[in-house]
Design a protein with these regions (language model features):
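Conserved catalytic SET/PR domain of SAM-dependent protein methyltransferases, capturing the structural core
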Residues: 1-94
Length: 94
């Protein structure tokens, strides 16, 4: 098995929101799980590229869903090719 930091449907590029961001390279359906954003190991949080490059927006198109010691990124809206993926930043537990 080969580790891929991002699914084929995403890329990292310059964002008008802040610095770099995650962008869709193809249309992504509402309700799609995109991968792991964070992993909790021995009280330390490891952040993946999905967790590190997604920018904040008050009206986001993604949410983070915790399952056990991992958090997953899920779309909550249809995301069109070229559109930036966003998340509403909150204080959370992994």
């Amino acid at each position: 098995m080969t580790y891929k930091p991002l699914p084929d449907s995403l890329t990292i590029k310059s964002s008008s929101i802040n610095g770099l961001g995650l962008f869709a390279t193809q249309d992504i359906k509402d309700g799609t799980q995109l991968g792991i954003t964070h992993i909790l190991i021995n009280d330390e949080i490891i952040r993946s590229p999905l967790g590190g490059f997604i920018n904040h927006q008050d009206n986001p198109n993604c949410v983070r869903i915790p399952v056990g010691n991992k958090s997953y990124l899920h779309t909550i809206k249809q995301i069109n090719q070229g559109e930036e993926l966003t998340l509403k930043y909150t204080i959370y537990k992994v």
